[in-house]
Design a protein with these regions (language model features):
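N-terminal flexible segment immediately upstream of the FAD-binding catalytic core
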Residues: 1-79, 95-128, 158, 268-273, ...
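General beta-strand structural signal in soluble alpha/beta enzymes
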Residues: 40-45, 66-68, 88-92, 99, ...
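Alpha-helix capping/hinge segments and adjacent helical runs
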Residues: 473-485, 514-517
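C-terminal substrate-recognition/cap domain of FAD-linked oxidoreductases
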Residues: 3-6, 42-51, 256-463, 471, ...
Length: 529
């Protein structure tokens, strides 16, 4: 079914009262929302400024900050701002790296106080209902506690201690697990959304499917036709813009997930859960070269085991120079490393270790027994954990030392083109003598080039970055596998998909949001608004 009927919790009497008051010359948004509806809102610049930047550090600007506590308050804020055409930027944990929570004027709607209802785990159905203002790590911990360690939510992005649930769904956050199970989308079963006009609806996966790439929405007497974008979107780990109907059909829930808040505000979420493993086998493997690491990844895919892993992380070019404990982990300065995590289910850990040693020997990647470090002891795990997490800190130190700037690519290409893409990127950076390191999610062929450059190198870096983006698109990949588009990568979206795709996203957005108030500047820039 492609027909969705939305409801409004704002009564007609309230709408008449609101519309009468907002036309008054002396109308004050802060005063009206706080006095009439007891909504937390402020225009205190010292408070508002604390929400004007996310982790992208892109400068933002806003006049108001509101922190509603429930969806009725959210609906009232959106309805009034829509009537007044005040831009609304949705803010969650502000952990995004591309500026999707950076405001461009108007009002910031923070979901930080949307903490009701309490986390509810259904052990029989293996689901969890959770408030959008809950931090991801708090939810993950609560699920384990409530289920007596029998169920888990597997998505584990690095920012999980700070990221809020609403933001992870809006941006389709992903973690370390290779394949589709590593991204939020796979686990979302239900959401509740509020449109800019204040109307809301609960959406269940599989309930609403597009017909001829269209959805029909009804909000009271208003009928809205949604034309879903249908440009081709590579079916790999992909956070580059909203989901599309390039196969003619799309689940409505997938159109909202990962759309970075440009269509609607998410106020409730239900996730499916996974059974927990009995134990995990954690290995650090030293290899002689990057080519051997890529070869190992291909071998594991041929053995149909790569998507059973819960991590396949790569530490390559120049990483050793930014890591603690490198002598304990690597054989020599030219070595690269792989961290592998395998869930052990209905098997003794010793048997699993023996099986993996044999498997790695069969890979013909020149892996010897002393190239494998078992991380399951507390001492070894602590050593690896400190080494892994020292990289960004040391990279930041280097950046400050050089009075430099850093940029991290988020590109991804299919495995068959992976070698060509990696070699191209290495070549162009090394030819220009640019400092960088390479690490990331080898299971998805999604590695990050962390580039550190001086202000004098800014022009050449911009050119190099665009060449890397163009190369990824040419090889069937995309510019963003996990970080999204936000405001920082709108040019990359055009480079990857073209103007026609941007036009399709614009048409879809303006059907949901005719006044273009929600998350202006995310994914695309709409001229004249």
């Amino acid at each position: 079914m492609n027909f969705l009927k939305f409801k409004s919790k704002i009564t007609n009497k309230e709408k008449i009262y609101i519309n009468k008051n907002i036309k008054k010359i002396e109308f004050s948004l802060c005063s009206f929302l706080s006095k009439e509806f007891n909504i937390d809102i402020t225009n205190d610049i010292d408070i508002v400024s604390g929400f004007e930047r996310d982790w992208s550090n892109i400068p933002g600007d806003a006049e108001y900050l509101t922190r509603p506590i429930n969806d009725i308050q959210c609906a009232l804020v959106l309805y009034i701002c829509n009537q007044l055409k005040i831009p609304v930027t949705i803010s969650a944990g502000k952990t995004n790296l591309t500026g999707s929570a950076t405001p461009m004027g108007g009002l910031i709607l923070s979901v930080i106080n949307m903490r009701s209802p309490n986390t509810l785990v259904n052990k029989k159905n293996k689901t969890v209902q959770v408030a959008v203002g809950t931090t991801l790590e708090d939810m993950r911990t609560e699920i384990l506690n409530i289920s007596n360690q029998s169920l888990c939510y597997p998505v584990d992005p690095t920012s999980r201690k700070d990221a809020l649930i609403g933001g992870t769904v809006s941006c389709n956050a992903s973690g370390f697990i290779p394949g589709e199970k590593g991204a939020t989308r796979y686990w979302v079963n239900k959401i509740k959304i509020i449109l800019p006009n204040g109307y809301n609806k609960k959406i269940t996966r599989g309930e609403f499917i597009s017909k001829n790439t269209q959805f029909n929405l009804q909000c009271g007497d208003e009928k809205i036709l949604i034309e879903v974008p249908d440009y081709h979107r590579p079916k790999i780990k992909n956070a580059s813009g909203p989901f599309t109907a390039d196969d003619n059909e799309i689940d409505f829930i997938d159109l909202i997930i990962g759309s970075e808040g440009i269509f609607a505000l998410i106020t409730e979420v239900e996730f499916n859960l996974s059974n927990t493993a009995d134990k995990y086998l954690d290995l650090f493997i030293t290899l002689r070269s990057e080519q051997e690491a890529i070869k190992l990844r291909g071998f594991l895919e041929k053995k149909n085991i790569i998507y059973d892993l819960t991590a396949l992380e790569y530490f390559g070019y120049n990483c050793q120079n930014y890591m603690l404990h490198k002598k304990q982990l690597f054989k020599d300065e030219m070595s690269v490393g792989i961290y592998l995590q395998y869930p052990v289910i209905d098997e003794l850990i010793d048997n699993s270790i023996e099986k993996w040693i044999k498997l790695l020997d069969q890979s013909n990647c020149n892996i010897k027994d002393d190239d494998i470090i078992l991380l399951n002891s507390p001492e070894n795990w602590r050593m690896f954990f400190e080494a892994r997490h020292s990289m960004p800190a040391k990279a930041l130190e280097k950046t400050k030392e050089l009075d430099a700037i850093s940029i991290i690519t988020d590109t991804i290409v299919p495995y068959e083109n992976f070698n060509e893409f990696i070699n191209f990127s290495h070549s162009i950076l090394q030819h220009n003598k640019i400092e960088y390191l390479l690490f990331g999610h080898l299971g998805d062929c999604h590695l990050h080039f962390h580039v550190i450059y001086t202000k004098e190198e800014a022009l050449i870096i911009n050119d190099i970055y665009q060449q890397i983006i163009r190369k990824s698109a040419k090889l069937g990949g995309v510019y963003s596998a996990e970080h999204g588009t936000g405001k920082r990568k709108t040019i990359d979206f055009l480079e990857c998909y073209g103007q026609e795709a941007a036009n399709q996203v614009q048409q879809c957005k303006l059907a949901f949001d005719p006044n273009n108030i929600l998350n202006k500047g995310n994914i695309i820039n709409i001229k004249g608004s």
